[in-house]
Each structure stands twice: as C-alpha cells, then as structure tokens.
Amino acid sequence: MHMHMGGDPSAICAQTDPELWFPDKGQSTRDAKRMCMRCPLLDECRALALRDPHLVGVWGGLSAQERRRIRKGASA
C-alpha cells in the first residue's frame, strides 16, 4: 500500500503504480490528474490534501503547487 487514498480499494491510486502520483520535477502531472478525475474518492482525497500542507505529489487531482495556491487564496 502506498500513500493517497490507497487504503480504500475503490481508490484509483490503490490500483495503479505509485510513481504516477509522484512525478519527478519537470515531469507532467496530467496523467495522474486525469486518473483522479475518474476516482470515486476525489472529493475526500482533495479535502484531505487541502488540509495537510505536508503532502507531496498529486492528490485529489491537484499538484502540491496548486494546493498551495488554493490554501493561500483561502487565507487571504
């Protein structure tokens, strides 16, 4: 089992290669985000990711940078 919502077998991330969710710097996050959009746990995963600023990789269809921008906007 890896990070993400992988503890739930219905999570798309539980059924795929963990490397997809943690692309190296400069690699595209597009494929991971596309998979997230099909996941039944998208909303729960995104909410978790927005609450925890220490998470890295793609969570809930958002990159770490996108989540930082959202959190920054919410606190303004």
Swiss-Prot record:
Domain (4Fe-4S Wbl-type): residue spans on this chain: 12-69
Record keywords, A-Z: 4Fe-4S, Disulfide bond, DNA-binding, Host cytoplasm, Iron, Iron-sulfur, Metal-binding, Transcription, Transcription regulation
Coiled coil (UniProt feature): none
GO cellular component, one term: host cell cytoplasm
Residues that coordinate or bind [4Fe-4S] cluster: C13, C36, C39, C45
Induction summary: Expressed in the early phase of the viral replicative cycle.
Impact noted for substituting C36S: Unstable iron-sulfur center, small orange colonies in M.smegmatis. Binds DNA
Effect of V56D: Small orange colonies in M.smegmatis. No DNA-binding
Cofactors required: [4Fe-4S] cluster
PTM entry text: The iron-sulfur cluster is sensitive to air and oxidizing agents; degradation is complete in 3 hours upon exposure to air. The Fe-S cluster can be nitrosylated by nitric oxide (NO).
Binding note for cofactor: Binds 1 [4Fe-4S] cluster per subunit. Contains 1 [2Fe-2S] cluster after reconstitution of overexpressed protein from E.coli. Following nitrosylation of the [4Fe-4S] cluster binds 1 [4Fe-8(NO)] cluster per subunit.
Main location: host cell
GO biological process: negative regulation of DNA-templated transcription; regulation of DNA-templated transcription
Disruption phenotype: Dispensible for viral growth in M.smegmatis strain ATCC 700084 / mc(2)155.
Superkingdom classification of source: Viruses
Listed result of changing V58E: Small orange colonies in M.smegmatis, poor DNA-binding. Decreased DNA-binding
Compartmental location: Host cytoplasm
Alphabetical list of InterPro entries matching this protein: 4FE4S_WBL, Whib
A molecular function (GO) term: DNA binding
Summary of subunit composition and partner proteins: Forms homodimers in the absence of a reducing agent.
Sequence similarity: Belongs to the WhiB family.
Function: A dominant-negative regulator of endogenous whiB2 expression. Low level expression in liquid culture in M.smegmatis leads to elongated and highly branched cells, with multiple nucleoids, similar to the effects seen in deletion experiments for whiB2 in M.smegmatis, as well as loss of acid-fastness. High level expression is lethal. Represses expression of endogenous whiB2. The apo-form binds to the whiB2 promoter found in M.tuberculosis. M.smegmatis cells expressing this protein will not grow on plates.
Protein name: Probable transcriptional regulator WhiBTM4
